[in-house]
Amino acid sequence: KEKVVKSVKAADSLSVEISKLKKKGINQKKNIKCHVLAYKMVDGKKVTVAKSITIHAAGKKNKSVTDAKSIKLKKTSYVLAKGKKAVVKASIVKKNKKRPIINHISEFRYATSDSKVAVVSKNGKITAKGKGSCSIYVYATNGCAQKIKVVVK
């Protein structure tokens, strides 16, 4: 079961800063893992309608690892024929160049906006499925993301 840390209504800001868990300050020397759930009320009960990716972020005072500052992509768009493949080439720009990125999960995670047009593997291999266009999202461990446009002819 999910632990609710903070509820935000649609009219509120799109960003939220959480500084305490269970009335205690967050230890900034440790890594943080979290995700966001969006829900709506149906017959007086909360029904989850969306879930963000889970992020793994280094605490601000962590001296052993760092987070991604941004993601650099070799290409930001691909035009493919149905059935053809392409591989995403990406690199991370670190906040602190001397420290490694959190490495207990893969360096990059991928998602597609429309799996009928193109799918992407956990290794970043894009496969064109059907005619149309979609976006492929490349996520770093801390949720930093870049978007790639894919057109399938």
Question: Would you name each region that the model predicts?
Answer:
Residues 43-61:
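Extracellular fibronectin type III
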Residues 28-32, 49-52, 101-109:
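Glycine-rich, flexible loop segments associated with nucleotide phosphate handling
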Residues 18-44:
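Beta-strand-rich modules
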